[in-house]
């Protein structure tokens, strides 16, 4: 479909995206070692851009502008949606698209504290949304059942229900983890290594890196580099964070897979610990059937695994 052709309707775009996502997920599931190339054409495919735009436009942040001062309403009323998407697609195809710094705002919290809010430009949000449409079905094939945060068809209540169930199954200790400044501290090089396990398309890898390095424009007007972490408030950030934090999921899943129900009973009789991980984004618990010393050892083990991603 060329830039002069009519853009697909919303229904047509959703159907095409779902069809391609289903194929990507199936291919990733069938071959756990497959590295995907030739994905950059999907990022600028009209159907993917239409779906990405609709998701950005329907988001509650659509009325908020990034560093360029443009909101989703401005795009609709002044630029025209098709022209906006056509211009964005042309830049992506010509490889002249460059993410802009994230606009930072400090939001008051109860108790006098403030939290940082990052606001990307509408253009950057659309490209991030399109990237997510392509990458998510691939990495979903690898994500473990113990991960519940920011995943399709999963929610916090599911994680809570799993914890309640496991707590009724002889798990006596709970190791609670809250990863310090997770979204700010993830190592770019370590994250890049994990993305490259599945993605061989240099254009896609370059786009991901460009968003990671886009920088932040503070309220004082000063621009700061982003040498660690995922884009503040970015549509792509939860997926990238899950890719990084799945290092913990994989570590525990690998250990769990080696232990059959009979072996777990044998471990219990021998005084060895049995344990399960439940993670929701940057919060996790390890439920332990064993002693306090064993629970503390698993806490240290978790910290060591997360340390490989620059986290503590």
Report each predicted region and the residues it spans.
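A contiguous, low-structure linker/loop signature
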Residues: 62, 70-114, 125-133
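Short runs of predominantly hydrophobic/aromatic residues within well-ordered alpha helices
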Residues: 17, 21, 36, 49, ...
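Short beta-strand-to-loop capping motifs
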Residues: 75-76, 121, 286-290
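Residues in well-ordered beta-strands of folded domains
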Residues: 25, 57, 105-108, 118-120, ...
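Duplex nucleic acid-engaging cores and interfaces of nucleic-acid transaction enzymes
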Residues: 16, 118, 122-132, 136, ...
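Short alpha-helical scaffolding segments that buttress acidic/His motifs in well-ordered protein cores
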Residues: 52-56, 130, 207-212
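Non-catalytic, polymerase-adjacent accessory regions of viral genome-replication enzymes
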Residues: 1-82
